[in-house]
Amino acid sequence: MKLDKLFEKFLSLFKKETSELEDSDSTILRRSRSDRKKLAQVGPIRKFWRRYHLTKIILILGLSAGLLVGIYLFAVAKSTNVNDLQNALKTRTLIFDREEKEAGALSGQKGTYVELTDISKNLQNAVIATEDRSFYKNDGINYGRFFLAIVTAGRSGGGSTITQQLAKNAYLSQDQTVERKAKEFFLALELSKKYSKEQILTMYLNNAYFGNGVWGVEDASKKYFGVSASEVSLDQAATLAGMLKGPELYNPLNSVEDSTNRRDTVLQNMVAAGYIDKNQETEAAEVDMTSQLHDKYEGKISDYRYPSYFDAVVNEAVSKYNLTEEEIVNNGYRIYTELDQNYQANMQIVYENTSLFPRAEDGTFAQSGSVALEPKTGGVRGVVGQVADNDKTGFRNFNYATQSKRSPGSTIKPLVVYTPAVEAGWALNKQLDNHTMQYDSYKVDNYAGIKTSREVPMYQSLAESLNLPAVATVNDLGVDKAFEAGEKFGLNMEKVDRVLGVALGSGVETNPLQMAQAYAAFANEGLMPEAHFISRIENASGQVIASHKNSQKRVIDKSVADKMTSMMLGTFTNGTGISSSPADYVMAGKTGTTEAVFNPEYTSDQWVIGYTPDVVISHWLGFPTTDENHYLAGSTSNGAAHVFRNIANTILPYTPGSTFTVENAYKQNGIAPANTKRQVQTNDNSQTDDNLSDIRGRAQSLVDEASRAISDAKIKEKAQTIWDSIVNLFR
């Protein structure tokens, strides 16, 4: 029955009842005196009921409500894209890198997809005889059983045809509710209009769950009997068909007795449906279940090679494009991203070296997050969101690079202190106060061990991360200027107290991704792009359903960006970033630390943010919760610097190698760089040419392994397609 005809019936019935009500109104006016006398003798409740025609009114209201619900469910069915279902079930969601090369896949609830010709006729018949005996005759709905389920408020089982079950498995939850049953009804009608019975049966058998994490008849046949779906015997087919009612309850690995009893019931159904005779039933029922069990299922091949990046892709698809996790994983999408596999692989290999990360006395590793972002487009080229021990476990782990809320420490100074100063016309060598000051109740000093002096030039104040000049600058320019700048650079300043401490990051919460986006403005001539992972998403039919539109926001003038870069070049040559400086590459940027509340000699957060015209690398290090047992010793140069330098040294060779057009502020003022390649290497034994070569080699192996696995899978898929075509020629 077509949906349009259903609504025609609703409307005709509605019109009929309305017409009858109008007729009854005219009739009562013509009643005789005796009729009215009889009416007067009726009880007051019945009299009231009859006088105002409440039966008719309730009936019309009920029909109206039913009509509205029907319209809503009709709209739900029409808005659901059933055209893509077959393609979505056949294919996995694939993730592509920025060069549109396949980088991995999301498996979801998918098994090995096979065509109906590769599924045993015994298995097809067993399923139809048990789940939907009128399958080839009905239009997707068993109306009697469906309305029984509706009357019992969804509590009555067995009301679903194979088509309805396919609709439920593909689009709906497993809840036994009237709403779900009604949606299932309309979706089943839509599926019946779009697909043939053979296509529906094929999709159902490939999308059904068979327990033990196994989906689809092909993988289920291998899991329980060690054969392909085309090779299952009659008794094996009956066992698999019986599992559909309760995959865990009738699972032969969980209970041979329950599974055997259920198998025998299916065999009886097949006799009743005329698919087999009594002798075949008896013979199949005598087969010992345990003798048939043989597991040859190899499990799913994991293509989740870049966990932190793929997690971030899924999170962005959910939060930005309003897709559900289930849709993303199971609908066979093609997700094109900004991923650079060379960046990502090298970053992951660096994080696997746990000796680079501090460890608490109880053995807990400090956590960390790093982002590599292209400053012109905002495309994230690589991200690692957890230390390697945790990064490979599970799906959608917490990502410290994109989801954490940490104090930025001194990395906020270029944003809220020195950018407003440069915009106000301050010269880079302007002398700033560098002596201990008391501002009402707020007293500030430089970080432990850093000397104070009467004055210091602004470029030195930034490079050496001096607190006193930074706070003095905000005091001179006004706290409001600092807040305006922070908001302009994309920081959330709404709940931050308007105090001078904002110059040091007080009250501000951020993460490496957000800071990378902010610093991109310095690398991109004052234009800040929108950080993003996804460039576009296509559905299983190749239609673009979501896409990123590159946008840049002018946050500062190019001249201001150039002057800021000139000062931040000094961070890595003469300032706090010397130990973070990569070999053979020039970077600008800033370091940052946050003092531990219980001891100012320890730190809660350590940051290094560095950039070239081609890439921004933002790195954070710290324990999830800082306390007397979990803290970082020393400053950034003792912790985060080692990880940052390894990342920079391994991914910078893959960048175009663009150079800055501005001169280091130290050099402008006649001061030679303090860092040398020799000094950098002697600060950390892990940073050797052999070590870098090993990291790059292992990273290349990871990329090559991904490429080979994808290539092998495509060859296997293509070979299967060719073979199926050859077989079909002789059918």
Swiss-Prot record:
Oligomer status and interactors: Homodimer. May also form higher order oligomers. Self-association may depend on its transmembrane and/or cytoplasmic regions. Interacts with MacP; interaction is required for the function of this protein. Interacts with MreC in the elongasome.
Its protein name is: Penicillin-binding protein 2a
Transpeptidase: annotated segments: 301-731
EC annotation from Swiss-Prot or TrEMBL = 2.4.99.28, 3.4.16.4
Family (UniProt): In the N-terminal section; belongs to the glycosyltransferase 51 family.
Gene encoding this chain? pbp2a
Q: What practical uses are noted?
A: Transglycosylase/glycosyltransferase (GT) domain of this protein may be an alternative target for the development of new inhibitors of S.pneumoniae as the beta-lactam antibiotics targeted against the transpeptidase domain of this protein have increasing resistance.
Report the protein's function: Cell wall formation. Synthesis of cross-linked peptidoglycan (PG) from the lipid intermediates. Binds dansylated lipid II and catalyzes the polymerization of glycan chains. Hydrolyzes S2d (N-benzoyl-D-alanylmercaptoacetic acid) molecule, a synthetic thiolester analog of cell wall stem peptide. Active against bocillin, a fluorescent penicillin. No transpeptidase activity with non-fluorescent lysine-containing lipid II as substrate.
Output compositional bias ranges, type Polar residues: 676-690
Q: Tell me, what is an example of a GO biological process annotation in this record?
A: response to antibiotic
Region annotation (Disordered) maps to 674-694
Primary location: membrane
Q: Which Gene3D superfamilies match?
A: 6.20.370.110, Biosynthetic peptidoglycan transglycosylase-like (1.10.3810.10), DD-peptidase/beta-lactamase superfamily (3.40.710.10)
- Membrane-protein topology: Single-pass type II membrane protein
Pathway recorded for this protein: Cell wall biogenesis; peptidoglycan biosynthesis
Indicate yes or no for the key word Heme.
no
Spell out where the chain crosses the membrane: 57-77
Q: Which GO terms describe its cellular component?
A: extracellular region; outer membrane-bounded periplasmic space; plasma membrane
Q: Tell me the residue ranges located in the Cytoplasmic compartment per UniProt.
A: 1-56
Swiss-Prot/TrEMBL catalytic activity: Preferential cleavage: (Ac)2-L-Lys-D-Ala-|-D-Ala. Also transpeptidation of peptidyl-alanyl moieties that are N-acyl substituents of D-alanine; [GlcNAc-(1->4)-Mur2Ac(oyl-L-Ala-gamma-D-Glu-L-Lys-D-Ala-D-Ala)](n)-di-trans,octa-cis-undecaprenyl diphosphate + beta-D-GlcNAc-(1->4)-Mur2Ac(oyl-L-Ala-gamma-D-Glu-L-Lys-D-Ala-D-Ala)-di-trans,octa-cis-undecaprenyl diphosphate = [GlcNAc-(1->4)-Mur2Ac(oyl-L-Ala-gamma-D-Glu-L-Lys-D-Ala-D-Ala)](n+1)-di-trans,octa-cis-undecaprenyl diphosphate + di-trans,octa-cis-undecaprenyl diphosphate + H(+)
* NCBIfam families listed in its UniProt record: PBP_1a_fam (TIGR02074), strep_PBP2A (NF038276)
| Transglycosylase as annotated region, ranges | 78-300
Give the Gene Ontology MF terms in alphabetical order: acyltransferase activity; penicillin binding; peptidoglycan glycosyltransferase activity; serine-type D-Ala-D-Ala carboxypeptidase activity
Q: Which UniProt keywords apply?
A: Acyltransferase, Antibiotic resistance, Carboxypeptidase, Cell membrane, Cell shape, Cell wall, Cell wall biogenesis/degradation, Glycosyltransferase, Hydrolase, Membrane, Multifunctional enzyme, Peptidoglycan synthesis, Protease, Secreted, Signal-anchor, Transferase, Transmembrane, Transmembrane helix
Q: Where in the cell is it found?
A: Cell membrane; Secreted, Cell wall
On the tree of life, the source organism's domain of life is Bacteria
Q: How is its activity regulated?
A: Optimal transglycosylase/glycosyltransferase (GT) activity in the presence of 30-40% dimethylsulfoxide and 0.002% Triton X-100. High GT activity in the presence of CHAPS, Triton X-100 and n-dodecyl-beta-D-maltopyranoside (DDM) detergents, and to a lesser extent in the presence of Cymal-5. GT activity is inhibited by moenomycin. 50% inhibition of the GT activity with 2.8 uM moenomycin. No effect on GT activity detected with 2.8 uM vancomycin, but complete inhibition with 28 uM vancomycin. No GT activity in the presence of n-octyl-beta-D-glucopyranoside, Cymal-3 and Cymal-4 detergents.
